[in-house]
A protein has these predicted regions:
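Short alpha-helical DNA-recognition segment
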Residues: 25-47
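A short, Lys/Arg-rich alpha-helix, primarily the initiator
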Residues: 1-23
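Residue-level signal for the short linker/turn that defines the boundary of a DNA-recognition helix
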Residues: 15, 25-26, 52-55
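Residues within the helices of the helix-turn-helix
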Residues: 18, 29, 58
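Alpha-helical residues within the helix-turn-helix
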Residues: 22, 33, 62
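Short, charged recognition helix plus adjacent turn
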Residues: 2, 62, 70-82
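Short, basic-rich loop-to-helix N-cap that marks the start of a DNA-contacting helix
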Residues: 49-61
C-alpha cells in the first residue's frame, strides 16, 4: 500500500467537495462567504491545487450543510482502491 499521496488524489477530493457545493446549489463565491474564505481558496481546493486536512474537510462540509461522514464516504469511494 503506497504511503504517499498523488496529485490526482487531491483532484478527487476537490471534485467531491465541488459536487457537494453544487448539491447545496451554491456558487464558489457563496461557499467562500459561508466559510469566511475567498473564492480563490474554494477554487484551488476544488481543482486539487490546495491540500486540505481532515478538520478542514469537516468545516467545509458543515459550511455547505453537508454531512461530513457522507462526504468522507464519497471521497473514499471516489479515491479507488488503496
Amino acid at each position: 500500500m503506497p504511503m504517499w499521496i498523488k496529485p490526482e488524489q487531491y483532484r478527487v477530493v476537490g471534485a467531491c467537495l465541488a459536487a457537494a457545493r453544487r448539491r447545496a446549489k451554491l456558487t464558489q463565491i457563496q461557499a467562500a462567504e459561508r466559510l469566511g474564505r475567498t473564492q480563490s481558496f474554494v477554487s484551488e481546493i476544488e481543482r486539487g491545487l490546495r491540500r486540505v486536512d481532515v478538520l478542514e474537510i469537516i468545516l467545509i462540509a458543515r459550511g455547505l450543510r453537508a454531512n461530513p461522514l457522507k462526504l468522507f464516504a464519497e471521497i473514499a469511494r471516489s479515491a479507488g482502491p488503496a
